[in-house]
């Protein structure tokens, strides 16, 4: 039962709302009468002359709606005493709409009139209409018009609209530079745009392509600007292959000594050692990286079953997979390449299979020095780390190894504090976190809840707060300073519970459980969402995908999207930006 005081408060609020509505209704009625009088030219004290049209109005109404008219009618300007006021360079229909707005507070903004309305609202200082136009244009921004909207916003002093348009231009630059609007830009705007660090591109060669495209559109007249334009391209960031085969062969470059020097400087950069490269600043600042994240699943025990999952549209796409069948392996993604390592068939597999997602090509490298299965792996700063695992039929290992992708060499690092296999491992903020697992593949082996972290800078391990639940074969993902352990199994069977490790607080907390118990869970995170895409329950596999929103702590069982059919699969998030579109066809 509600308290008497709360009932009175609620009643007062209701009464205030009703009173406000009544006041608004009365005001609208008064203004409606005044608008009718205006149309009948009753008591009008000013006529706006717009080209051939005469628009009657009341000074007090115009002055209350427009700061422009307020100054005009309340100062010693000539128009303050004139019955007829001429508005030069104005459109009659637009002024008619603005006058109507002054009386009714209503106006229709659409794609046909928004630019004219915004221009007039800005000139006559009618802020509500200006805001409506800005809000409308912000919703309409796309690749075909964003450059024009940015120019318009700058001319009309609309910083909020300009920021929206510019942000779109930078985020979608690879689409924008292929439009006609880009080709029509003046040299000042092009040089400013190409100089932005926030251009979102797959690689710097796209900025080069934009520059050359603009220059060639009107080559005779734009020839004098060639050096200024190409100076904004960061040639050291372009691949050596593209520089030598495409850029150096471009006639525009060959015919200009200054531009040729830029290209040669870019090629020299690739001959420098990593240490010497770090000393260079000019022309080497990276742009904002364009991403197209998908989740790759590889069949493992069924190698021909490999697919991408696209979290944007929930589609599955086949991946060509010729690699060897292997059980209990691991996979990681780094710099366009998926590395599949470890695992066994009859014996541990020594080879590491590599898949370049951009080139859609497979090749092999030497695998971990100690071949084993049930290991875990993750990547950080150009290095692939592998931990634990089990040599066939044996106990879990303390082993910790590192593969340097730059030198293509393996190195043994300090061992973990605890031996473990069938565990989880993730990179977070430059550190390597290892959680759970078991002391061996035998069913009787103890399942672990212990956790530890490795610092590559000091090459040391530190024990962390243990998980609330001991688990193995679980999913382990990093999302915004939290590490989530999802499902898996303890000594008694499958788990539906989920917990996260708060990195800052060094503590684990339980969250909402999965709507499914998984002995084996295959999951990955994109953004704030954790996707469970495959798994085994003990008597059957996961039928449909599950989604967990880490921000709302809510699970969704998506009955429209089937799960990946292979429960022993390998899973990792990949960036397919720049991949051949044929590779990604469904």
From Swiss-Prot:
It is found in: Nucleus; Cytoplasm. InterPro entries: BACK, BTB-kelch_protein, BTB/POZ_dom, BTB/POZ_KLHL7, Kelch-typ_b-propeller, Kelch_1, KLHL7_BACK, SKP1/BTB/POZ_sf. Pathway: Protein modification; protein ubiquitination. The keyword Cytoplasm applies. One of its GO terms (molecular function) is ubiquitin-like ligase-substrate adaptor activity. Pfam families: BACK, BTB, Kelch_KLHDC2_KLHL20_DRC7. Its main location: nucleus. CDD domains: BACK_KLHL7, BTB_POZ_KLHL7. Kelch repeats lie at residues 294-336, 337-382, 383-430, 431-481, 483-528, 530-575. SUPFAM superfamilies: Kelch motif, POZ domain. Residues 44-111 form the BTB domain. Keywords: Cytoplasm, Kelch repeat, Nucleus, Repeat, Ubl conjugation pathway. GO terms for biological process: proteasome-mediated ubiquitin-dependent protein catabolic process; protein ubiquitination. Residues 146-248 form the BACK domain. The keyword tRNA processing does not apply. It comes from the Eukaryota. Substrate-specific adapter of a BCR (BTB-CUL3-RBX1) E3 ubiquitin ligase complex. The BCR(KLHL7) complex acts by mediating ubiquitination and subsequent degradation of substrate proteins. Probably mediates 'Lys-48'-linked ubiquitination. Homodimer. Component of the BCR(KLHL7) E3 ubiquitin ligase complex. This is Kelch-like protein 7.
């Amino acid at each position: 039962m509600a308290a008497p005081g709360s009932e009175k408060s609620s009643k007062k609020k209701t009464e205030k709302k009703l009173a406000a509505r009544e006041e608004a209704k009365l005001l609208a009625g008064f203004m409606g009468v005044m608008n009718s009088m205006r149309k009948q030219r009753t008591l009008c004290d000013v006529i706006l002359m717009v080209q051939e049209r005469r628009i009657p109005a009341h000074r007090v109404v115009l002055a209350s709606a427009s700061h422009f008219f307020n100054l005009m009618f309340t100062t010693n300007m000539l128009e303050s005493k004139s019955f007829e006021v001429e508005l030069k360079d104005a459109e009659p229909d637009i002024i008619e709409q603005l006058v109507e707005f002054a009386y009714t507070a209503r106006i229709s903004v659409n794609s046909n009139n928004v630019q004219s309305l915004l221009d007039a609202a800005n000139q006559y200082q009618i802020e509500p209409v200006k805001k409506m136009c800005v809000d409308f244009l912000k919703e309409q921004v796309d690749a075909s018009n964003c450059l024009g909207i940015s120019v318009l916003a700058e001319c009309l002093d609309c910083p909020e609209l300009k920021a929206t348009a510019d942000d779109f231009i930078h985020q979608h630059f690879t689409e924008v530079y292929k439009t006609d609007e880009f080709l029509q830009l003046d040299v000042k705007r092009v040089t400013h745009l190409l100089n932005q660090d926030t251009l979102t591109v797959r690689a710097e060669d796209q900025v080069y392509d934009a520059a050359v495209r603009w220059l060639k559109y009107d080559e005779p007249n734009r020839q004098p600007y060639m050096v200024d334009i190409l100076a904004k391209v960061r040639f050291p960031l372009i691949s050596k292959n593209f520089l030598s085969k495409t850029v150096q062969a471009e006639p525009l470059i060959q015919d200009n000594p200054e531009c040729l020097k830029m290209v040669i400087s870019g090629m020299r950069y690739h001959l420098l050692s990593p240490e010497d490269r770090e000393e260079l600043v000019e022309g080497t600042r990276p742009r904002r990286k364009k991403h197209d994240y998908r989740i790759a699943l590889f069949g493992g025990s069924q190698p021909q079953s490999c697919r991408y999952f696209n979290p944007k549209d929930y589609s599955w796409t086949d991946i060509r997979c010729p690699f060897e069948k292997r059980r209990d392996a691991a996979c990681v993604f780094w710099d366009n390449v998926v590395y599949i390592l470890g695992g066994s068939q009859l014996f541990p597999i020594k080879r590491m299979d590599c898949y370049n997602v951009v080139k859609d090509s497979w090749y092999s490298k030497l695998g971990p020095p100690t071949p084993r299965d049930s290991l875990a792996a993750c990547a950080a700063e150009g290095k692939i780390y592998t931990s634990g695992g089990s040599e066939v039929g044996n106990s879990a290992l303390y082993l910790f190894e590192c593969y340097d992708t730059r030198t293509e060499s393996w190195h043994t690092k300090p061992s973990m504090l605890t031996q473990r296999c069938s565990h989880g491992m993730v990179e977070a903020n430059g550190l390597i976190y290892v959680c759970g697992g078991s002391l061996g593949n035998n069913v009787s082996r103890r399942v672990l809840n212990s956790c530890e972290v490795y610092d590559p800078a000091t090459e040391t391990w530190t024990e962390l707060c243990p998980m609330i639940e001991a688990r193995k074969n679980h999913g382990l993902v990093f999302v915004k300073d939290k590490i989530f352990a999802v499902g898996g199994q303890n000594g008694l069977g499958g788990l539906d519970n989920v917990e996260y490790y708060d990195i800052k607080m060094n503590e684990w907390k339980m969250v909402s459980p999965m709507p499914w118990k998984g002995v084996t869970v295959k999951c990955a995170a994109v953004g704030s969402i954790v996707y469970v895409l495959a798994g085994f329950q003990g008597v059957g596999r996961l039928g449909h995908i599950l989604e967990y929103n880490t921000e709302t702590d809510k699970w969704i069982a998506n009955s429209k999207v089937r799960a990946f059919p292979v429960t022993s699969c390998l899973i990792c998030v990949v960036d397919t930006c720049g991949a051949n579109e044929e590779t990604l066809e469904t």
